[in-house]
UniProtKB/Swiss-Prot annotation:
This is 2-oxoglutarate-Fe(II) type oxidoreductase. Endocrocin and related anthraquinones compounds have interesting activities for medicinal uses, including anti-inflammatory activity. Belongs to the iron/ascorbate-dependent oxidoreductase family. Endocrocin is specifically produced in conidia. PANTHER family: 2-OXOGLUTARATE (2OG) AND FE(II)-DEPENDENT OXYGENASE SUPERFAMILY PROTEIN-RELATED. Induction: Expression is positively regulated by the transcription factors brlA and laeA.
């Protein structure tokens, strides 16, 4: 059996060039990744190293704030799911401890009377900015500049995905027009020695939306499951690269042929870890259903049609409810002792 390999590193710059042969080779490599485990890394994109550096600085400045300041903008359904995600308030992997991380949810600043907010579309609303930062305006500007750059990169990646399916680049325009996305700043304290399974940085899970673009620091810790062998493969950091992984929406639309793989974070470095995932959800009203090119004769359709909002909201709700139940049970145990 061939030894499983970590996600390959692909030069995405050819997508923007005029070499049709090189572009076709990129499309073929991405297709192979989608059929394997849905993970690959890209270099040669248009997001500048300077913007990446400034955005990491924003994340670190936020997490350096006192807890009391961060909790002033704590995330809740009543706050449009924007703001601070407290340590261990999210359980990605059923049956495990909650995730050993804290985060900040950001997105486009939408007024409360925007149709998406009125209709309570997932994570749509005004941002909750940390007022305790000395350089708050700079923090806002950098965060939103980065959001815009990643939104465009996500649309470019989706265009390549359309090509991998032998559609035109514009095939998924109805999915990307009016799309929503979530930018998250994440901070992982060092993983306790000998506690790699009981409390993962992020438990094993599949992402819920269309695609994720992840910028990680040099600490590492991200692992993707090779399902045929059951091995966890380290996704080693590449300076400036984005880890791309397909999520459940594309897996549903391809009837499971394109993979949304299990992945997790185990911070075994003994150091703090920072990462910046960008979750491209897509147009919340887009109906994801099995594409005709993936309906093989005699093969049942695995999932009924559902809107992007329905697919993502159900999955996200489960992760929060699991963490709440776990923490409530733990508090009950401690109170009884």
């Amino acid at each position: 059996m061939t030894k499983p390999q970590p996600p390959p590193i692909l030069d995405f710059s050819v997508f923007y060039g005029h070499d049709s042969q090189a572009k076709a080779q990129l499309v073929q490599r991405v297709r192979e990744c989608c059929l394997n485990n849905g993970f690959f890394q890209i270099t040669g994109h248009k997001v500048s190293p300077e913007l990446q550096r400034r955005t990491f600085d924003c994340a670190k400045r936020f997490f350096d704030l006192p807890l009391i300041e961060k909790k002033k903008i704590e995330r809740s359904p009543d706050a449009f799911n924007r703001g601070y995600e407290a340590f261990q308030s999210h359980m990605s992997q059923p049956g495990s401890a909650p995730d050993r991380k804290e985060g900040l949810f950001l997105g486009p600043d939408l007024a409360e009377d925007h149709p998406y907010c009125v209709q309570k579309k997932l994570n749509c609303g005004p941002n909750r900015w940390p007022q305790g930062l000395d350089d708050l305006e700079e923090f806002k500007l950098v965060s939103m500049e980065y959001y815009a750059a990643l939104f465009q990169l996500a649309k470019d990646v989706v265009a390549v995905l359309a090509l991998t399916m032998d559609y035109e680049e514009t095939f998924f325009d109805p999915l990307t027009e009016g799309a929503i996305a979530t930018l998250r700043y994440l901070h992982y304290p060092p993983q306790p020695v000998g506690d790699a399974e009981a409390g993962l940085g992020t438990g094993a899970h599949r992402d819920y939306s269309c695609i994720t673009l992840l910028l990680q620091d040099g600490t590492g810790g991200l692992q993707v499951l090779d399902e045929p062998t059951g091995q966890w493969l380290d996704v080693k950091p590449v300076p400036g690269a984005y880890i791309v992984n397909l999520a459940n929406v594309f897996a549903r639309m391809t009837n499971g042929h394109y993979k949304s793989a299990l992945h997790r974070v185990v911070n075994k470095s003994g150091m703090e870890r920072y990462s910046i995932p960008f979750f491209f959800t897509g147009n919340p009203d887009y109906v994801c259903e099995c594409l005709s090119r993936f309906r093989k004769e005699g093969e049942p359709v695995r999932h009924p049609p559902a809107t992007v909002h329905e697919v993502v909201a159900e999955a996200v709700r489960g992760t929060v409810e699991r963490a709440n139940r776990y923490n409530a049970e733990r508090q009950g145990i401690h109170a009884a002792q």
